[in-house]
């Protein structure tokens, strides 16, 4: 009997349909909220830092896009902006900062040096931070214009909104045989 039913589609019950519908609404709502509340952690190492400060100034106003308040603790941030060149001695530090960030977390490679090592093609420079940590958005330029950075933030916002977000990740509790009282 079970082998006859293996190829048939499983029909969802009303409760499963309701839970799926509710999860879809929660996911869309969380995606919308998260895309406008990015808490950045700037990892600034080189000359692109000047353009990072320009991007955060009143003229370009990154606050409009929800990325205004830089955090100086990775535990309070969800967007790591790697700004500039990363050398091999800094690589473990960058990886540790990434691991300290709470989930969900995103990474932006700010400038050519962070994206591909730039013109520092030598043994001491990491040829792109994607060799150390996963990168969500690459912003080109040496240094990138503030408009390019804001475009990168908008691309990241689209990515965040289209991701699946869960309010609570429920996992079944383990059953312990012969526990207390048995």
UniProtKB/Swiss-Prot annotation:
SUPFAM superfamilies, alphabetized: HydA/Nqo6-like
Keyword Cell inner membrane part of the UniProt annotation: yes
UniProt cross-references to Pfam families, sorted A to Z: Oxidored_q6
GO MF annotation: an example: iron ion binding
Entry's EC annotation: 7.1.1.-
Chief subcellular location: membrane
Binding note for cofactor: Binds 1 [4Fe-4S] cluster.
Gene Ontology CC entries for this record: plasma membrane; respiratory chain complex I
Keywords, alphabetical: 4Fe-4S, Cell inner membrane, Cell membrane, Iron, Iron-sulfur, Membrane, Metal-binding, NAD, Quinone, Translocase, Transport, Ubiquinone
Subunit structure: NDH-1 is composed of 14 different subunits. Subunits NuoB, C, D, E, F, and G constitute the peripheral sector of the complex.
Name of the protein in question: NADH-quinone oxidoreductase subunit B 1
Organism encoding this protein: Anaeromyxobacter dehalogenans (strain 2CP-C)
């Amino acid at each position: 009997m079970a082998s006859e039913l293996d190829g048939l589609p499983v029909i969802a019950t009303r409760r499963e349909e309701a839970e799926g519908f509710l999860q879809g609404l929660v996911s869309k709502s969380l995606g919308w909220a998260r895309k406008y509340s990015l808490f950045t952690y700037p990892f600034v190492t080189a000359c692109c830092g000047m353009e990072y400060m320009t991007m955060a100034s009143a003229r370009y106003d990154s606050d409009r896009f929800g990325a205004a308040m830089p955090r100086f603790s990775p535990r309070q941030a969800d967007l790591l902006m790697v700004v500039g060149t990363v050398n091999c001695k800094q690589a473990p530090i960058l990886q540790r900062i990434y691991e300290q960030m709470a989930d969900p977390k995103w990474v932006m490679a700010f400038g050519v040096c962070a994206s591909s090592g730039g013109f520092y093609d030598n043994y001491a420079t990491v040829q792109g931070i994607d060799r150390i940590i996963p990168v969500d958005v690459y912003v080109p330029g040496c240094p990138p214009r503030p408009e390019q950075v804001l475009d990168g933030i908008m691309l990241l916002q689209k990515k965040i909104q289209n991701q699946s977000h869960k309010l609570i990740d429920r996992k079944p509790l383990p059953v312990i045989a012969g526990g207390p009282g048995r």
